[in-house]
């Protein structure tokens, strides 16, 4: 899937959470499972199912950001376990964005429009596998000024 299609898909979802302006017909909530929500949206290419979560802890505390972690499924495009994240700001292109759970670390390769993705589906698969076993995942990113932010996500409810 192209970066443009990913951005077109994620921006309305992000703003739905931020502003609550999309109608129930556009994004349908399937359910809330502890710290995760499952939703479905219909695009021109077909249905897209996704799970999302907000951080349970953010650093620095003084920054008010709408960070989210997403896992998307696009059956019509044969895409499963597509991992993406937004920290609520435009990422610095010179610094890495990483996810860490236990001793496992994963790097987000693609950064566009305030979102980041993992380019390699094998790495996404390993990350999902780790998320199913873990209790928390930590996303580290850097804003345009180079300041570090760390978002801690609970994995309770990730496997329903």
Specify the residue positions occupied by each region the protein language model found.
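Bacterial N-terminal signal peptides that target proteins for export
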Residues: 1-9
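Bacterial N-terminal signal peptides
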Residues: 9-18
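Sec/Tat signal peptide C-region and signal peptidase I cleavage site
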Residues: 18-24
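A generic "folded-domain core" signal
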Residues: 24-160
